[in-house]
Amino acid sequence: MNLEGKTFVIMGVANKRSIAWGAARALDKMGAKLVFTILNERFRRELEKILGDLEGNHDIIVECDVTDDEQVEAAFKEIGEKTGGIDGLMHAIAYAGKDELQGGYSDTTREGFKNALDISAYSLAVVSKHAKTIMNEGGSIATMTYLGGERAMPNYNVMGVAKAALESSVRYLALDLGESGIRVNAVSAGPIRTLSSSAVGDFKSILKEIEERAPLKRNVDQLEVGNTVAFLLSDLASGITGEVLHVDSGYHIMA
């Protein structure tokens, strides 16, 4: 697949283990131009350490705190000015406090609930609002979800609720933006060791269960998920919108 001449925004790279980095690697190999958003200078420094691993020269890095509406608007205005327009966006932003990802869901705090839903779900809506203003015809948006948004899973708690809201947002955004020719989809990735997953209680047992019960008897990696994101952002997926595509070695089909 050749994506030369296409420009994509990648949101959510924390380090080399990030799923967003897997998508960046996949898109880079296909010749795409990448624009990265980061939360703050600490994440900028982490990103700059690994950018040299990519084949292309991707030098546009824009600060964007998704909890700040004015900063989101300013970030996409800057991206539009520097690129002339984008062809797609990957949203891989989620957060819940570590205490919220252990024990019982009934112990979720009001503040923890608000933060998780704001950062993990509402952020897709506000990002889409501003991304659409600089999106070229036939553009695409992809976000990241997890099976815990469909099923109750131990310790995932408020993040599962946030992912359920995110998946519903994908469908409503697909309807909303479809008339502008913009597609919106989600990839439901299997468990992967990332900075975010390290906060989930007893994460090792989740990985072990996938190896034992998934049809492929193994876990997936960042690049496998990244390749799927690249597919959804490309014209090869031009007829797909409002979809949640599972990349989890088939685990989601198991009873």
Label the predicted regions.
Residues 230, 241-255:
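Short C-terminal tail/terminal secondary-structure segment
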Residues 183-193, 233, 246-248:
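Conserved SDR Rossmann-fold cofactor-binding beta-strand/turn motif
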